[in-house]
Amino acid sequence: MKAKLPAERRGFLTTRGHSRLTKLHYGRPEFHYEVWHHTGDGRLEVGLHFEGAADANQRAFDFFRSRMVEVKARLPRAELEPWDRGWTRLYETLPAPQLDEQVLDAGVETLCTYIITLEPLLERFERS
């Protein structure tokens, strides 16, 4: 995956969730990219999650909501929504009845597009 990212985006850190969940971030684990295989639904979720303090998550929601036209120009299937425990996510799902090579390739491509598109906006948000 790193080879598909620009050099300045290759220095991410990773954490594992449960068996079919991976998170990666650039120094703030509460704001992370996530890939999660929802086995029961047969879907692969790819997105940017805001799982920090409720006020920070709300500010992130407001920031990205005002930029959804820009986001959807590169990520047309992306949805922004409040989520569990006061969290927020900007994500999409892909069909994934099984984690086969085709699904993994699509997940990597989608995740790379999310990072390339959203990380500059996330950096701008964090400076605001």
Regions found by a protein language model. Name each.
Residues 1-2, 63-75, 95-128:
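Ampiphathic alpha-helical segments that act as solvent-exposed interaction surfaces
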Residues 1-87:
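Polyanion-binding interface signature
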Residues 81-103:
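Short, intrinsically disordered low-complexity segments
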